[in-house]
Amino acid sequence: METIQAIRSRRSVRKYQQRLVPHEVIEQIVADAAYAPSWKNTQIARYVLVEDRTTIDKMAEEMVLDFKLNEKRLKNCPAVMVLTYVTGRSGYERDGSFSTPKEAGFEMFDAGIAAQTFCLAAWERGVGTVITGYFDEEKITRLLNLPENQKVGCVIGLCSPDEEPAAPKRKSVEDLLTYK
């Protein structure tokens, strides 16, 4: 698949086949996602694969902050990838001071780049994804026993797509681009 084709064809997949993605495919996707750019090559993204049905159901029922649509999507998903990021590195100098006025905001920026790279690599391999950003971070952190220096960036549903969603309408270049 060519890069532009992947960018233009990748969709959030919300209808899944109930089969797990093989671990070797997941490992290939993570290996590709490791090439996502990051602040000073800090590579702060980490990946936690959750396949245990009880854990996924608990995440869906208790950790999507009463957003029923996400609860339903997560409950139906055969596996989820929790993308976390190591804190205190991206946007920081070695002495702990900030390198930029954006301060710790670069952590989520780098996590977002990693999430997009992960999703494009998954799509290349026929794996559907849907990114969820609305969740109870503290509960997920406790449930998955994440290290103290990691925060949850997003939760990504992983699946074999049951159908290929139609492309939503996109804004025109004229709406998006300004020349000065």
Region spans (language model):
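N-terminal accessory segments that position/regulate proteins before the catalytic core
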Residues: 2-3, 19
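A short N-terminal beta-strand-loop micro-motif at the entrance of redox/enzyme domains
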Residues: 13-28
